[in-house]
A protein has these predicted regions:
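Histidine-centered catalytic micro-motifs
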Residues: 132-138, 160-170
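Active-site glycine-centered loops adjacent to acidic/histidine catalytic or metal-binding residues
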Residues: 13-14, 48-49, 135, 165-166
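Extended active-site neighborhood of metal-dependent phosphoesterases/phosphodiesterases
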Residues: 23-120, 149-161, 171-190, 194-203
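Conserved acidic residues
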Residues: 7, 128-130, 160
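A short C-terminal boundary segment appended to hydrolase-like catalytic domains
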Residues: 201-222
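N-terminal active-site segment of His-dependent metallophosphoesterases
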Residues: 1-22
Length: 222
């Protein structure tokens, strides 16, 4: 990463595993942010299912400024539109361990409305490139509870790439495979030695994508 010139950084969820208190969360965030020049460039932390769990999950809100003050949203970086979704938990709301405290079903429904409004917006339509980011994959994985709600909306969405995580194993699905209407990249493992870095570089109307593993080896270059 030291040789990569980047404008901002995304961490795509499950970085803070089951946060128990402020000290633990702050320590983990410090480890990640120090390695990516967070004092010089914006850093976005997407919420994965593990950030939702444990005693300090609600306290994480104090550590982040979300775009639009929600865990999902969209913004422009130049003429590129970046759309972020929050998949919530990977288990149904009525799972006993949640004690009827979760309502991620409504969160997923809210994002259907958001997606329709976003894709109808001038900012989305005028963008030269469009990037979709969410933690749990919709394609290449059948366990996403958002599938039935989100897939019909995204089937013909003109995204240039979708970035996912959650499975702890790198994968790449070209457009058309897995019935996806855009290319999908799933990031790597659940430890630093198995991690992947996905580098997106846009010059004029061209979007180049490279994936590196923790050893610096190139896994994908398109």
């Amino acid at each position: 990463m030291k040789e990569v010139d980047y404008d901002f950084v995304f961490f795509n969820g499950d970085c803070i595993d089951d946060p128990r208190d402020r000290a633990q969360a702050s320590y983990i965030l410090k480890q990640f942010t120090e390695g990516v020049k967070a004092d010089q460039v914006p850093v976005f932390f997407m919420r994965g299912n593990h950030e939702i769990r444990n005693a300090y999950s609600i306290g994480l809100r104090n550590h982040f400024d979300y775009v639009g003050d929600k865990t999902y949203g969209a913004f422009n970086w130049g003429d590129t539109r970046i759309v972020m979704l929050d998949c919530g938990e990977d288990k149904p709301d009525d799972t006993p361990v949640y004690y009827d405290l979760n309502d991620f079903s409504q969160l997923r429904k809210d994002q259907v409305v958001f997606l329709k409004q976003e894709m109808a917006s001038k900012a989305f339509k005028k963008a030269k490139k469009r990037i979709l980011i969410h933690h749990i994959p919709l394609y290449g994985y059948e366990g996403n509870l958002c599938n039935d709600l989100w897939r019909p909306v995204l089937e013909k969405a003109p995204f240039d790439i979708c970035l996912n995580a959650h499975l702890h194993k790198y994968a790449y699905y070209p457009k058309g495979s897995q019935k996806c209407s855009y290319p999908v990249i799933i990031g790597g493992g659940n430890s630093l030695k198995d991690a992947t870095v996905i580098i997106l570089e846009k010059k004029k109307n061209e979007l180049k994508i490279k994936v590196l593993n923790a050893q610096g080896e190139t896994l994908l270059d398109i």
